[in-house]
Each structure stands twice: as structure tokens, then as C-alpha cells.
């Protein structure tokens, strides 16, 4: 088994409003190994999205530690956290968050340009990735001209363009019909197998979650069960 890519220990998150405290995460411990496909399932309000924000250094835990590639995220400066987000962690959301006035190509190239890659190289890499996700014929189209499934494919391409070690996906198929959701799942697994990128997927879809390597069930701010998919099932699908 590969070395842990991400390790969380004792993650707590408490929101305070006046004298009232709300504990959203209650001591979460888990790890993701390189190249794993992991699902987090649970009802709304169980703490899934809050945890994802902490793992992506978009929010800070009240207590506990997050180590990503041996860096303790909460001890890094804001600039170093931003660099890790740009270069080593990709993000996909239920709502694609594509820039409406930019083409698919421009949206995918944006993280590269922000990271200092020149326009020619950024366009080349973005084009290659859009071809990989089956959108070579749509690279000049804006988000409003794409279907829901196509927009999510663009969002996944954007998340992967910097060749991150980890992609955090928050309900990436939540707005899609079942067939399109299955297509997106198959795309994530294909890209995982090709690039070795690990995926952590928050989802309400138990059927899709069961297809990933590991499923973590969250309830009331804690993980209550962990299910590891059998190696035989993984081999049969590969």
C-alpha cells in the first residue's frame, strides 16, 4: 500500500454565535492513500462539506491536524496554502463554478495561468485535457452553451489541469440525471487509473459511492462506518 497522501487527526469544528456553540465535526480521524478513490456519504448537515473545506485549506479546524504530503496545512502561511491549492489539490463542486464569459478552454487553462504558466503552454495542456474528457469539439463553447454533464466534465478537467495529487469533489453529480452521473463517475475512475490522482468524493448517491475503493459514512460530525471495496470487485471493473 502506498504512503498516506492525507492524514487527519482529531478534527473538530465549532461555530460560535454569541453564547451559542455548534459543534459540526467531533474528532474526525482518517487517511487517504495515494491513488485511492474514497467516498464520504451522510445526510445533509452531518459535516461532510465542512470537512472537505478544511481538507482543502479553505477553512481551519477548531482543533486537530491535517497533514497533506507531509505538510501540516494549518501551520502553513496563507500564501503557501494557496500554492498547494493551486498546484496540488483540485476542486469539483455540485455547481460547476465555471466563469460564464470564458470558453471551456479558457476555464480549464485558468489555474495554469494563475500559477505562472505561459498562455501557449496553458492552452496546449488545457486542450489535451479537454480532449481526454471527450470535449475536443466543445473547447470554444461557453458554459451556457454546454449541457450539465459537459459543464461538469469541464470542471473536472480544470481540477486536473495542474496534475494534482488529490481532487476534492463535493456532490459532483448532484445536479445530474443517473446516466450522466454514471458517466462522470466512470470518467473519474478512468482519470484516476491513468494519472494516479486520488479522489475524495462527497455524495448522497450510495450506488455511486459503493463503486469507489472506500466508503466512509458520516453522522453527526463523526465517521460511524468504513467500508472497503473488495480487490476482486475492483479487478472485475478495471
UniProtKB/Swiss-Prot annotation:
UniProt topology in membrane: Peripheral membrane protein
Gene Ontology CC annotations of this record: plasma membrane
Keyword annotations of the record: ATP-binding, Cell inner membrane, Cell membrane, Membrane, Nucleotide-binding, Translocase, Transport
Binding site for ATP: 42-49
CDD domains xrefs: ABC_MJ0796_LolCDE_FtsE
Chief subcellular location: membrane
Entry superkingdom: Bacteria
Span of domain ABC transporter: 6-238
Gene Ontology BP terms: lipoprotein localization to membrane
Top class in the EC scheme: translocase
Compartment list: Cell inner membrane
Pfam families associated with the record: ABC_tran
Molecular function GO terms recorded: ATP binding; ATP hydrolysis activity
UniProt-listed Enzyme Commission number(s): 7.6.2.-
Task of the protein: Part of the ABC transporter complex LolCDE involved in the translocation of mature outer membrane-directed lipoproteins, from the inner membrane to the periplasmic chaperone, LolA. Responsible for the formation of the LolA-lipoprotein complex in an ATP-dependent manner.
UniProt family annotation: Belongs to the ABC transporter superfamily. Lipoprotein translocase (TC 3.A.1.125) family.
Quaternary state and interactors: The complex is composed of two ATP-binding proteins (LolD) and two transmembrane proteins (LolC and LolE).
Protein name stated in the entry: Lipoprotein-releasing system ATP-binding protein LolD
Source organism per UniProt: Aliivibrio fischeri (strain ATCC 700601 / ES114)
